[in-house]
Swiss-Prot record:
GO terms for cellular component: cytosolic small ribosomal subunit. The gene is rpsQ. It comes from the Bacteria. This is Small ribosomal subunit protein uS17. Part of the 30S ribosomal subunit. GO terms for biological process: translation. InterPro entries: NA-bd_OB-fold (IPR012340), Ribosomal_uS17 (IPR000266), Ribosomal_uS17_bact/chlr (IPR019984), Ribosomal_uS17_CS (IPR019979). PROSITE patterns: RIBOSOMAL_S17. One of its GO terms (molecular function) is structural constituent of ribosome. Keywords: Ribonucleoprotein, Ribosomal protein, RNA-binding, rRNA-binding. PANTHER family: 40S RIBOSOMAL PROTEIN S11 FAMILY MEMBER (PTHR10744), SMALL RIBOSOMAL SUBUNIT PROTEIN US17M (PTHR10744:SF1).
Length: 94
């Protein structure tokens, strides 16, 4: 079973929405080359990912992995939180 999971696609992106229960929206940026002008252009694609424990918050950098369909649009799950977003609510005011 471990060898099978290594074949699954993984992506790294930033959480843009955590308003749903056990679901986050992750924006994944990729660089693609323009076919005519050869300039590298940034493309963003959003994935809905399963967050079992509701740990992710907006701004977190996360790794997601492909999984079986969990709902109509959800085919990814959060594997780990790479970098946590800064918490501005607890910062002291000037």
């Amino acid at each position: 079973m471990t060898a099978e999971r290594n074949l699954r696609k993984t992506r790294v992106g930033v959480v843009t929405s955590d308003k749903m229960d056990k679901t986050v929206v992750v924006a994944v940026e990729t660089l693609v080359q323009h076919p005519l002008y050869k300039k590298r252009v940034r493309r963003t694609k959003k994935f809905k990912a399963h967050d079992e424990h509701n740990q992710c918050k907006v701004g977190d950098k996360v790794r997601i992995m492909e999984t079986r369909p969990l709902s109509k649009e959800k085919r990814w799950r959060v594997v780990e939180i790479i970098e946590s977003a800064p918490d501005y609510k607890s910062a002291p005011e000037v």
